[in-house]
């Protein structure tokens, strides 16, 4: 199976594309950097996807453990870069950090996938047999949940 992923940024001039996507043999994922708060959202999005585990994240505890294992090198590099940018950027980084949503789908076999999402990014799956479009949110009302 051949995979392809592309993230198209907003057309405004000077607008940073804060989103990241991957499509590999057994995983597809999207991370939507939330640039309205914090710094380096585009970096955090890419970092999350580049450090996804090979096996599915199945619980909040597993998500916390995974983030706990990967965050420090990212933080240290961004802290250094914010320091170079100056005091206001460093203060903003300390106060707000970086934000991004995440949705990932792991292919477990030819007939089974497992997905997880954090935030409001959504994975869609079209079931050819049932002709139903499935998604990682149960209902549209789920978007109103914190």
Task: Please state what every model-predicted region is.
Residues 1-146:
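PP2C/PPM-type serine/threonine phosphatase catalytic domain
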């Amino acid at each position: 199976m051949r995979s392809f992923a592309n993230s198209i940024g907003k057309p405004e001039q000077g607008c940073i594309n804060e989103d990241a996507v991957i499509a590999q043999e057994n995983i597809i994922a999207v991370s939507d950097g939330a640039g309205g708060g914090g710094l380096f959202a585009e970096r955090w999005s890419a970092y999350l996807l580049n450090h996804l585990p090979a096996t599915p994240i199945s619980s909040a505890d597993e998500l916390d453990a995974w983030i706990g294992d990967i965050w420090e090198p990212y933080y240290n590099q961004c802290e250094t870069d914010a320091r170079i940018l100056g005091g206001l950027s460093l203060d903003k980084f300390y106060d707000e950090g970086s934000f991004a949503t995440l949705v990932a789908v792991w292919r477990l076999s030819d007939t089974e996938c497992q997905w997880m999402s954090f935030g409001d990014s959504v994975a869609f799956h079209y079931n050819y047999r049932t002709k139903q479009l499935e998604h990682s949110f149960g209902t549209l009302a789920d978007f109103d949940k914190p």
